[in-house]
Amino acid sequence: MGVFLGGWYGGTIRRFCCGDIDESEFNASMERWRRLEHTLASSGTVIVKLWLHLGKKVQKARLKDRLKHQEIHHFTPYDKKSAENYDGLVSAAAKAITLTDRVDAPWTVIDAYDGNFRNASVARAIIAAVEAAVAVKRQNAVPVVPTKASEEEIGQISALDAIDLSRTCERGVYKKELAELQSELYDLTYKAYKKGISSTILFEGWDAAGKGGAIRRLTAGIDARITRVIPVSAPTDEELAHNYLWRFWRHIPRAGFVTIYDRSWYGRVLVERVEKLTQPEDWKRAYAELNDFEEQLQEHNNILLKFWLHISPDEQLRRFKEREEIPWKNYKITPDDWRNREKWPAYVEAADEMFLRTSTEYAPWHIIPAEDKKCARLDVIRIYRDALRKALEQKKKK
């Protein structure tokens, strides 16, 4: 159980009350919180939102008393300003409640004048919410699944078939350009660090497509102190006890830092779908949840890049056999790789729908031809370089 004092609403309500954000910014924030709550509730989280209300005179008297003991009660400038503007605070809170009061995350307003009544009311609200959730669970209610495209549309689209895999890169040219790109990348990522521009980069693609090699060449051009690579495998028991995005939320980079995911949250609509590890209503709902998550990343000064490294079935087979024959590459090949290969058509179908539903204007997919690993590595670094240039230029204009 998590208890949040003020939660994700408190800061936004106070900033709106104090005039530091306008109505459109306030409404956009409320919509983000509403979508977040829907994501959490859809995965089984019980959300209890409580507004403890005080009348104007009582609130003023209590604030006056607390200001006498600031060594105990710590106040921020926003706390003081919003408390002095009681009418504005109540108006902002009422607006927030109206915009975010939903069946899966309702608000409960409690009169907080009497402490005993307040405490009992809070307990009753929590008990009622948990009991209601248990009742729904027993009924095996299936959530409504939002969709953006029909099954007919999806069946006619195959993004991977259109990729030209014939490109090659001469080794001498590759080495020269790689060194130049890595040098430029080092400079750009340091400038981004100084400006507080974060980067979240994720890699998906076929087994043996060269994700690890591309990541190594990418990180070679970034200061090790500001970057980290998160290898993603099957979730642990601790991770399974949380919302499926929790294990990725934990690693979102701080301002100026770079996080690279080797596999990502898209496992929800790839391996979990193909291997039937997740119910259809859950992975279908995930498309909208992932788009919301990525939109929030992009809105917070974060470069988001999504790479799919693509190879042909024949090239994958060649690389698998090479891994079996070369002793120092044996660790790279497992029975799971061969089993996944047998499900190639199912993964193509899952990947096509993923591209269709989650390649957005703010977070497009970059499908990289990786039949020649050298070309793929250069493509990845070029795309990141260009994204850094664009972000730094936009930062300069503000």
Where are these regions (language model features)?
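Glycine-rich phosphate-binding loop of ATP-dependent small-molecule kinases
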Residues: 1-398
